[in-house]
Design a protein with these regions (language model features):
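Gly/Thr-rich phosphate-binding loop signature of adenosyl cofactor/nucleotide-binding cores
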Residues: 124-127, 131-219
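Beta-rich, aromatic/charged-enriched effector core domains that present basic-aromatic interfaces
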Residues: 1-118
C-alpha cells in the first residue's frame, strides 16, 4: 500500500477509529519479543494518556479487575435503557434490501431498533450510559442475568467499531463525566481499560500478526 501510494500520490492517513497509530505500536509489538502482555501494554497506555495518573504513578491501583466481578443482586432493578428511535431513511432501505436479497434465508427480520445508526443517536446512547449505567459499571462489568440483555454494560463497542463514535471522543466524554460526578474508580478504570487497553492491544496484535492469526488456530 505504501509503495503504491508513493507512485500515484495517495496520502495515507491513520484511522480515527483507534487511539494508537500503527507507528505507536511498532516498538511494543517488536518481533524480537517472544510474548506480549496486555498488562504491560495497558500501563504504557496509561502513562502515555495520563488518564488516572499522577506523574508516572497510577491513582490507586493499575487495575481494578478484581472489583469488576460482583454478582447481580436477585431483586435489583436494572437501569433504564433508552433505545434509539428508528431512522426511517436508513432502516426502510435496509429492510427492503434484506427482504429482497435474503428472503429465503432462515429466520425472520427483526425490525426493532436496538442500535444507533447515526452520530446523534450514538451520542445519545453514550449519554444514557453515562447517566444510568456508568456509576455501577465497575461492580457489574462481568455480570449476566437470564432475560436481561444489557444490565450495566455500555454496548459502545459496535458504535466505536462502526465509526459512529471515535474512541478519542468516548474517552474524553468518560473522563469529563467521571470527574464531574465522582464516578467510582472501579467503574472509571474498568471501562478505560477496555478502550485504551484491550481494544488497542488486540488491534496491535492483529496489525503485526494478522497473516499468522488468519492462517492458524491460535485463539
Amino acid at each position: 500500500m505504501k509503495s503504491v501510494s508513493s507512485l500515484i500520490k495517495i496520502n495515507r492517513i491513520e484511522s480515527p477509529q483507534f487511539l494508537n497509530s500503527e507507528k505507536d505500536n511498532v516498538t511494543f509489538f517488536s518481533p524480537s519479543k517472544k510474548k506480549y502482555f496486555q498488562t504491560s501494554f495497558y500501563k504504557n497506555q496509561r502513562r502515555k494518556t495520563g488518564i488516572l495518573m499522577v506523574g508516572e504513578n497510577p491513582i490507586g491501583k493499575w487495575t481494578y479487575d478484581d472489583e469488576n466481578r460482583k454478582k447481580y443482586p436477585k431483586n435489583k432493578l436494572p437501569p433504564q435503557i433508552i433505545y434509539p428511535k428508528e431512522n426511517s431513511n436508513y432502516s426502510s432501505e435496509a429492510y427492503s434490501y434484506v427482504n429482497t436479497h435474503f428472503k429465503n434465508n432462515y429466520g425472520h427480520l427483526n425490525t426493532d431498533t436496538n442500535y444507533p445508526s447515526d452520530f446523534v443517536s450514538a451520542k445519545n446512547w453514550l449519554n444514557n450510559f453515562l447517566e444510568e449505567r456508568f456509576v455501577e459499571f465497575g461492580d457489574y462489568e462481568d455480570a449476566i442475568v437470564k432475560g436481561e440483555a444489557i444490565l450495566n454494560h455500555s454496548l459502545l463497542s459496535p458504535l466505536i467499531n462502526s465509526g459512529l463514535l471515535t474512541p478519542n471522543y468516548v474517552v474524553n466524554e468518560l473522563n469529563e463525566y467521571a470527574t464531574k460526578k465522582s464516578i467510582p474508580i472501579n467503574s472509571y478504570e474498568g471501562i478505560i481499560r477496555q478502550i485504551i487497553g484491550w481494544r488497542e492491544f488486540i488491534r496491535g496484535i492483529y496489525q503485526n500478526y494478522s497473516e499468522k492469526m488468519i492462517g492458524s488456530n491460535y485463539w
